[in-house]
Design a protein with these regions (language model features):
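N-terminal basic/disordered segments at the start of proteins
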Residues: 1-33
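Small-residue-enriched alpha-helical segments and adjacent helix-cap loops
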Residues: 20-131
Length: 132
């Protein structure tokens, strides 16, 4: 049995299936990333695709034997979803996409992500950037 957090997998309530949530800096995805996620979800019969509060997209309900195969197919960073570290940095659209944006929150969030994502800390740390 995979331990919680091992191989970037999180055990689900049923204690038999897992979720994986690739690192998606500031929640910004491309059509290619969405296709990869959808293709993996179909191929490995994920129970659901779930948008997380950390602006990631989780493939939920995966079989233990499929976890490593999913990561190989996705070819994406596992990111820091568990442990005592800086988790995914969240950001609003800011001036890039929002008419109310007055600051480049996505740009700042991406910079913070490059600098701090996954950095070990005494406790889990979450960051958010607002541009309005």
């Amino acid at each position: 049995m995979i331990k919680d957090g091992e191989f970037g997998a999180i055990i689900q309530r049923d204690k038999q299936t897992y979720a994986v949530a690739p690192h998606i800096p500031c929640g910004v995805v491309t059509p290619e990333i969405l296709r990869k996620l959808a293709d993996a979800a179909e191929k490995y019969q994920a129970a659901a695709l779930k948008i997380t509060s950390a602006q990631r997209i989780a493939l939920v309900g995966l079989k233990e034997n499929d976890v490593e195969k999913v990561w190989t197919d996705l070819d994406m960073d596992k990111g820091a979803a568990t442990g005592l570290c800086v988790r995914s940095i969240k950001a609003c659209p800011g001036t890039a996409f929002c008419k109310r944006g007055i600051k480049d929150s996505l740009g700042m969030g991406m910079q913070l992500d490059k600098l701090y994502h996954g950095m070990e800390m005494p406790g889990k740390m979450k960051m958010g950037v607002s541009g309005c």
